[in-house]
UniProtKB/Swiss-Prot annotation:
GO cellular component terms, semicolon-separated: cytoplasm
Protein name, UniProt field: Protein-export protein SecB
Organism: Erythrobacter litoralis (strain HTCC2594)
Subcellular location: Cytoplasm
Cleavable signal peptide: none
Subcellular location, principal: cytoplasm
Family under the similarity heading: Belongs to the SecB family.
Listed GO biological process terms: protein folding; protein tetramerization; protein transport
Length: 178
């Protein structure tokens, strides 16, 4: 089909040969990202601004995923931050930062790793900025969360799960995650 000097050199559009024009390459990427839920509390204002004690920061995070359809998954990065002293809480921030990811033609293991390791890694800097802006808007120094190694945590969790399954083969099966 290629003519001399033609940019298109080989277009095999024969459906029997698999050239039906459909994109069968493995792909994963973000469609959009957004704040799904956010709560910001400043429970002891205005007195909190007179406190001299340095606060202790309690940071909790979790990753969730919900299938929207066969090719789209919503990934949620849940971050809870509480700054407190012996006098009480300075602020409490609860954030669910989410993204819609499209996944096509990936194996289950690759798709799982993208959803629970790579997608949170990509979402985190944006969620970190939301937290920093919220603490600044509360009247405190912006809280800059340290980077999180989501890929390392993912691999660690897989190793833990494999070890738990190996222990379960020799005796009673351990209870599943609640």
């Amino acid at each position: 089909m290629a003519d001399e000097g033609d940019v298109l050199t080989d277009l095999d559009m024969d459906p029997a040969a698999g050239g039906n024009g459909a994109d069968n390459r493995p792909t994963a990427g973000f469609i959009t990202q957004y704040i799904k839920d956010m709560s910001v509390e400043n429970p002891n204002a205005p007195g909190v601004y007179q406190w001299q004690e340095q606060p202790q920061i309690d940071l909790q995070f979790n990753i969730g995923a919900n299938a929207v359809n066969e090719e789209v998954t919503e990934v949620e990065l849940k971050i809870n931050v509480e700054a407190k002293t012996d006098q009480g809480a300075l602020y409490i921030i609860e954030l669910v930062y989410a993204g819609l990811v499209g996944i096509r033609n990936l194996g289950d293991d690759q798709a799982h790793m993208f959803v629970y390791a790579e997608a949170p890694r990509i979402l985190f800097p944006f969620a970190r900025r939301v937290i920093a802006d919220a603490t600044r808007d509360l009247g405190f120094q912006p809280l800059m969360l340290d980077p999180i190694d989501f890929n390392g945590l993912y691999m660690q969790r897989l190793q833990q799960k494999a070890a738990e399954e190996a222990q379960g083969e020799g005796g009673e099966t351990p209870a599943g995650d609640a």
